[in-house]
Amino acid sequence: VEDDPMIGKSVQQGLRQDGHTVDWVRESRAAELALATTSYEMLLLDLGLPGKSGLELLAQLRRAAHRIPVLVITARDSVADRILGLDSGADDYLVKPFDLDELGARMRAVLRRHAGRADPVIALGDLRMNPATHEVTRNGQPIVLSAREFALLQALLEQPGVPLSRARLEERLYGWGEEVESNAIEVYIHSLRRKLGAESIRNIRGVGYLVPASQ
């Protein structure tokens, strides 16, 4: 959530190049709508937003027991501002200007801390997925997936036995405004089957894709 177009665009592009799916909004109301309709791993939040401030949005989320990790990104660099942000529920605080590599490192650190608060592992048969560390194993052997292969597999594993439509999967893999090739989902499904086994993902014709509830 960033109202500065130069910062917002550069962060969005940098994170997408690192394999993240990123939605960028410019004010709190749009952020509220996005959070109400989409599941996110993390919120990057500027404090100096038009209308409702970032601090007000953060406090509102925490009052509603929203547990999404929040990394505050702001030009406010006084000790008092940092304390206020952290006390309002931020997980970390990064002062502008910043390096994108440092942003990525802080994001990973926040996600690791959140992963330690509960068992994040998704398990189905001999398949194990850790969304916090982006690790996948089968029979204890690591499986290397791209960021979008991981996101697609995670969406399917979260609802085993339930077919998900192509449109639903595209929502998980791509941010708002990103161009989606017509056969993108099929390409990622083919790659996942090659790595996990032909029967690991099934196609329910006219409905969507699913992972069997038992593997």
Where are these regions (language model features)?
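Short boundary/linker motifs that mark transitions into or out of structured domains
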Residues: G125-E135, V207, Q215
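Positively charged, aromatic-enriched patches within helix-turn-helix-type DNA-binding elements
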Residues: E135, G140-S200, R205-V207
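Glycine-rich nucleotide-binding loop
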Residues: A30, G206-L210
